[in-house]
Amino acid sequence: MRLGGPWAWLLGLPTAVVYGSLALFVSVLHNVFLLYYVDTFVSVYKIDKAAFWVGETVFLLWNSLNDPLFGWLSDRQFLSSQPRSGAGLSSRAVVLARVRALGWHGPLLALSFLAFWVPWAPAGLQFLLCLCLYDGFLTLVDLHHHALLADLALSAHDRTHLNFYCSLFSAAGSLSVFASYAFWNKEDFSSFRAFCLALATGSGLGFVGAARLLRRRVEAAGREPGCPAMAVNDGLCEEELLVGGEEAGSITLGQYLQQLARHRNFLWFVGMDLVQVFHCHFNSNFFPLFLEHLLSDHISLSTGSFLLGISYVAPHLNNLYFLPLCRRWGVYAVVRGLFLLKLGLSLLMLLAGPDHPGLLCLFIASNRVFTEGTCKLLTLVVTDLVDEDLVLNHRKQAASALLFGMVALVTKPGQTFAPLLGTWLLCFYTGHDLFQQHPPAPVGSAQPWPEPPAPPPAQAPPLRQGCFYLLVLVPIACALLQLFTWSQFTLHGRRLHMVKAQRQSLSRAQTLDVKMV
């Protein structure tokens, strides 16, 4: 009876809460990983410089390829539009398969996270293996989690409801960044290891528990009429035929890529999202540099650390306000408004100049918060593209994970372009090469190796001016490009309603076919 009470309470949680909690179990690990993995291998394990760059290069290639690879392996059976013979799968069975995958891959993600903080191999080899293992399991978790957003719900209202809880739990998970400051000590690493062990244990158990709850909810939805157990999708009540096997009706990777090349809205979206990913990582890479050269004389070190920490939490809290707006006005209108806001704030900052510390501080923080927040909203747009892809190509089932993987394949180069283009622009404008001096290190991180001393003070004014123009002109250029590409995107308004209606009618038609057979 003692166990029955809490378990009964957990079973009574809404599906959206259980789904959103998965974002918590990822966020508590990933934010700590981003903040400390370089410092750990450089300052604690003393990794060799050549081994560090070899590991980062291999990681860059693996990080770019694993999204479409795992998406293809997961969803290739869903691509055929031709009827085939074989064992049937229902829409509910697809969701159950994704939930089971999360139940396995989530704990493995937690184990791969733990592998960073205990030396168990030569530093270079451990660095390479840990990065590839961690990113592989993180990709699997992200793909199936995002795919569930498209599979559990069809209407925009229900999807924003699910995304609302993802933002709420992601904000809670970001608090692990603040807690980590109390345990981080390069001289005595044992307390930080214990902290990471506690995070990994909680995350792994959370994945197992959440996957079990979701599985019971989906299974109950198939047994009970009207789907009372599922709060967000009536479609899971239906037994939609999805046949397996590798018969002649299957689609090859080349044919799928041709279909994507004809998917006009997909092409415009990934063009816009490439710029968005670039801008997000540009802000992350140069946030400490802007604080150092534009605000170091006006704010304390603790204030700068607080701004850095709050920038991890604020985008998720910000989305709690924007998601209700998405329900009312649509994601397209809200994203367009955010692009206009980015352009307007950047133009105002350009006109004001670099001599207003308060305004600069507000702009640097808001620029990062709004940009990161926009990235979170774009997940909803990808789910709409999943619907349109299913309708345009008459698929038997939505290839959700595969489409998310293809979006990541096209947009991830923005992560690489951000630091390269930013440092090149700064060097071109000011003659200042960041690699020729010790750049300011973010809180909780460190640059791998000491560099020669900074240039003489006479170069400081041009560098400060260069940082300011980089800060305001990059958002202006990004906003203009995004407003143009977003204006070409037509999956909103009447067209979006038509796609939703056609997907619902396809689902009902498939259900009738199965019942007639």
UniProtKB/Swiss-Prot annotation:
It comes from the Eukaryota. InterPro entries: MFS_trans_sf, TMEM180. It comes from Bos taurus (Bovine). Residues 44-55, 119-126, 180-191, 293-305, 351-358, 430-466 are cytoplasmic. The chain crosses the membrane at residues 12-43, 56-74, 101-118, 127-151, 156-179, 192-223, 265-292, 306-325, 331-350, 359-393, 403-429, 467-485. It is a multi-pass membrane protein. It is found in: Cell membrane. Pfam families: MFS_2 (PF13347). This is Transmembrane protein 180. Disulfide bonds: none annotated. GO terms for cellular component: plasma membrane. Residues 1-11, 75-100, 152-155, 224-264, 326-330, 394-402, 486-517 are extracellular. The keyword Nucleotide-binding does not apply. Its main location: membrane. PANTHER family: TRANSMEMBRANE PROTEIN 180. Keywords: Cell membrane, Membrane, Transmembrane, Transmembrane helix.
